[in-house]
């Protein structure tokens, strides 16, 4: 019984960072806009990630889950290295992190809304 409690506690401790990260709680809650150039993109699971160059800084931008990206109309080809885009969403609450969660991407004047229910 004691080892079962220990395993349950250990599982909860190890899962906490992942649960805290997914969702919006790690952001500062304010609106944030970032315009730059795609250095790399991965629209895979558990959620897509863009690496962008903005004024000589490297930013990590979390986009939606694969189904959400597809529903918004995003494709890998749109996010090829060198593509310029604007991302609207929320940045990390830690200002030392160049990290944000995207709600919308604007590519060639076309808006791709990942979270239409949050608008």
PLM regions: where:
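Positively charged n-region of N-terminal signal peptides that target proteins for export
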Residues: 1-5
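Bacterial N-terminal signal peptides
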Residues: 7-17
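Short boundary/loop segments of OB/S1/cold-shock single-stranded nucleic-acid-binding domains
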Residues: 18-32
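Conserved hydrophobic positions within beta-strands
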Residues: 36-38
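Short aromatic-glycine-enriched beta-strand elements
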Residues: 44-53
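A short macromolecule-binding patch
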Residues: 57-66
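Short nucleic-acid-contacting surface segments enriched for D/E, G, S/T with interspersed K/R
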Residues: 71-87
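OB-fold/S1-family single-stranded nucleic acid-binding modules
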Residues: 92-116
